Amino acid sequence: MTSRFFTQVGSESEDESDYEVEVNEVQNDDVNNRYLQSGSEDDDDTDTKRVVKPAKDKRFEEMTYTVDQMKNAMKINDWVSLQENFDKVNKQLEKVMRITEAVKPPTLYIKTLVMLEDFLNEALANKEAKKKMSTSNSKALNSMKQKLKKNNKLYEDDINKYREAPEVEEEKQPEDDDDDDDDDDEVEDDDDSSIDGPTVDPGSDVDEPTDNLTWEKMLSKKDKLLEKLMNKDPKEITWDWVNKKFKEIVAARGKKGTARFELVDQLTHLTKIAKTPAQKLEILFSVISAQFDVNPGLSGHMPINVWKKCVLNMLTILDILVKYSNIVVDDTVEPDENETSKPTDYDGKIRVWGNLVAFLERVDTEFFKSLQCIDPHTREYVERLRDEPMFLALAQNIQDYFERMGDFKAAAKVALRRVEAIYYKPQEVYDAMRKLAELVEEEEETEEAKEESGPPTSFIVVPEVVPRKPTFPESSRAMMDILVSLIYRNGDERTKARAMLCDINHHALMDNFVTARDLLLMSHLQDNIQHMDISTQILFNRTMAQLGLCAFRAGMITESHSCLSELYSGQRVRELLAQGVSQSRYHEKTPEQERMERRRQMPYHMHLNLELLEAVHLICAMLLEVPNMAANSHDAKRRVISKNFRRLLEISERQAFTAPPENVRDHVMAATRALTKGDFQKAFEVLNSLEVWRLLKNRDSILDMVKDRIKEEALRTYLFTYSSSYESLSLDQLAKMFDVSEPQVHSIVSKMMINEELHASWDQPTRCIVFHEVQHSRLQSLAFQLTEKLSILAESNERAMESRTGGGGLDLSSRRRDNNQDYAGAASGGGGYWQDKANYGQGRQGNRSGYGGGRSSGQNGQWSGQNRGGGYAGRVGSGNRGMQMDGSSRMVSLNRGVRT
């Protein structure tokens, strides 16, 4: 038939009949306008009856079409196409057998195998034709030879029967198909009646398409099939029949073209008709595995509704294990094939393959990934967090089960997951979660499960034995103590290390700095953390950050700076804390590295506030560096406590115009400039204007502590700067200048004298400080310089040896602990005894490196004019303070996995 274009033009070369047909079609198109309701195609075809084919017929048609394509390929000797169609027909066979529930393959498939086998033998016999084949065709022929030989072994008996009597086998096939597909016929009848039943008036105002009704019937087909299975005679549904169906479904898992949700539904239906508790348990394990496969990618997460079903399935597994104590879950020994056929009243042990710990860890991982992917500023994120008690209830029940079974190693792994869900929560958040868990009702989840399972009930009914709600002690500390004690007794090395870090983190969160510090020093985790996995290194970094915040809240400025200094040494805070991806101008990351780093990110509710962390670090550095720079004004670069702070200060001083402070750095730099001039009031006002203080619950007491420390360091800075200008200085005058009580001034100055930071003495009758002039010989100055250089060389050699030996061997770290040069590497008690107790011994007889540095600096001061007491007086103690900061907390570089 010609085109309408020529019809509209009115070509005289066409037949008259064709012209009339085309004109009629054009007229019909004009009448049946698609924008008119009465002109719809569904109403126009009143004489055509819609035919709905059952799924079985559709699958057979697909297989028949593929077989026809194979015949065409045989005619042209195309083995490449033949190989592709052979793989295709094998996949279609699985679908056909699944739908028809037949034991034997259809005759069409056996006939195809016989045809292929004969054709292959002919092709192999014709060697001349084989030589003329192309390379791809020859490879496909050889591949087809192997595939067909392997495949035909599975159907040897059927092939032999067909070769003996092909006509008889073809006659038997329709009868078998009719017997196997009674259920499909009934569903087809229902579909036909639903389509033929409702008639629609073409002139009606509302035109409801019959496709919607058909779609509703198709949706209910699954439920009807299940109902048919449940209404079958129980004698027909045997353990063997269910086991065979179970193996067929499991065999299809992971294959291309298999719908994952459909696979989960099929396995879920099998749990309803399982004949024994062990069989139901075995199928439930496969259901959970299939649910994990719903989202196979690494970037996404399991759908939330599937996650909840997975948790409910695991609780059902625990119900079965608790009720039937003779059933044992084990993944080390392959159970017998007929193990699950043993009845309910069987007294012996029944082994079922499974791993509850692995499943729980996967559930926890999927929950973690969902929080990573959901936008934290939406309601959905908050709703997702409300599911956490559901996971904690599951973990608690699994841990109780393992403890009853005596498997304490597995119980320790489960306890670690519970610890990692609690350690970062303050007591207020813990109380809110505990109240939420008490208010959560189980009816919602139970109703959802009933709706999905449909009206039929299971053959094996398992009551809810294990509780669906978690139980929490009133104090989060009490719960942590119970869990970590179990882990310390029974966990492996990695589990113990992570539990220890979580325990330290929680102690720091609860303001127990001394306990947290002692746990860290006794565990020696800082010496071995570089050998652990990256997630544990991230946990270590988070713990050190929390420990630094705790020390700051307790007023321990030196210790706080020691914990945070390494964290801010490389400008990669976000990366080290897993709170963002850092970008470096010198190191470009591959897309794979970026994806891996994003997968390690912490969820938003677990983030540490970076502004607060930066403020604490810079304030601590300011309180330590300003007196240190005043004490070493002639050689400021020689003794550096915080390189990061010095760099920021240099950048700030190079600016021609200083704008009002905007961010945390600007505020701290402005406070530093004021403190350097001795204006402690302005320094405190600038710091007090920071917004981060509102994040602290005891804000007023912390600000009072900061103000007192600013006054103290302002006093020290003043004495370091102007001691050379005085012969004596009144105690009363110092107290009035810095608004500090006289006993406190006396204590500060006396400590500086004892530590040889200030070369002076007290005149008790007049209550004055008398400054002394110090002069050194040339030999003494050279000796002090040599001592300092030797100490630096020895320390560098120790670090080089330690990096080569991995921190062990010659016990060089213990020597550094004895010298009080490493906070985090200190031994329990001795080396890390903080500034107050360590400085006394270090000033005169302890740390030779600090002493030597002070003497050398003093001599330099003497050469430059021998100011009164200025050279020697303020050097040694500041040297000691600097040495305490070295190598402090052993933060870990995640890119290289070594200490930075």
From Swiss-Prot:
The keyword Cytoplasm applies. Residues 839-848, 857-866 have a biased composition (Low complexity). InterPro entries: EIF3C (IPR027516), EIF3C_N_dom (IPR008905), PCI_dom (IPR000717), WH-like_DNA-bd_sf (IPR036388), WH_DNA-bd_sf (IPR036390). Keywords: Cytoplasm, Initiation factor, Phosphoprotein, Protein biosynthesis. GO terms for biological process: formation of cytoplasmic translation initiation complex. The keyword Phosphoprotein applies. One of its GO terms (cellular component) is eukaryotic translation initiation factor 3 complex. The modification Phosphotyrosine is found at residue 35. Component of the eukaryotic translation initiation factor 3 (eIF-3) complex (Potential). Binds to the translation initiation factors TIF3C1 and TIF3H1. Interacts with CSN1 (Potential). Associates with the CSN (COP9 signalosome) complex. This is Eukaryotic translation initiation factor 3 subunit C. The gene is TIF3C1.
